[in-house]
Every structure is written in C-alpha cells, then in structure tokens.
Amino acid sequence: MPTPYRVLRSVACDADIEAIFDHLFQSYRDLGDPTTDALTRAAARVRGIEDALAALGDVPFQGPMPPDILPGIRPVPRDGAVYYYIADETLSELRVLAVFFGGQDHRNHILRRILSGAGPQG
C-alpha cells in the first residue's frame, strides 16, 4: 500500500472550517438546541469534516481536475462538504485550499478566491 500524502491546510481552509463551525452552531441554536448541545453537535460535525480532510492524503488523486479553474486543482465532495486541493507528487503532499459546506456555490467561491489572489498558498 502506498504511503499517504502529507495533508497541509491553507490559512483559507482553516478559516473555512471555523466558518462552518460557526454556521452549524448558529443553525443548531436557531433550531432550538440549548447552547451546550449546539456546541457538541457542531464540534462533532466539524471533527467529521476534519477527519475526511485528513483522509484525502490516502487517495490523493481522486476527483476530476476541472481545466478552467486552476491547473492541478481537484474538488472532492464528502458528506456535505466539498474539498478543493492540489496534490504534489514530487513532495508527496496535498494542499487543501478550501472547504465548502452545504448548498454553497463552491465553484464560484473557489474561483473568486483564486482571482482575489489567495491562490494555492492562500
């Protein structure tokens, strides 16, 4: 079995995960969950997202490479989230550029992020 790629998270990816947590927490509160329950549920969901993100390194070349976004970028959906990443075969690394959740227009979000200069390092 091949060695998994090291998974690196961009600053934007970390911000995405924080925003997902905030969104989930507020949604659970709006639906009537007590604060502690909403925190617990949001944290559990985000742990699942982070686990799926880490597992991307096990199969780094999954998903299509849309030619009109950024060379080498791959969007991969998992359990309600879409992960955008670039795998570097030479370094055996996978850089996660973004994580979008739910019904977001993730394609337009990643295009705006790239055009704003966030690029692969952002």
Predicted regions and their residues:
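Conserved protein kinase catalytic domain
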Residues: 21, 50-53, 100
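Enriched for short, Lys/Arg-rich terminal
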Residues: 73-76, 81-122
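GIY-YIG nuclease signature motif recognition
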Residues: 13, 49, 85
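A short, surface-exposed loop/turn module that caps and links secondary-structure elements
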Residues: 50-77
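Generic structural signal for secondary-structure transition and capping sites
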Residues: 29, 54, 58-61, 81, ...
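Short, flexible helix/strand-to-coil boundary loops that buttress conserved ligand/catalytic motifs
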Residues: 21-24, 60, 110
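Arg/Lys-rich, positively charged N-terminal/basic patches that mediate binding to nucleic acids
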Residues: 1-46, 122
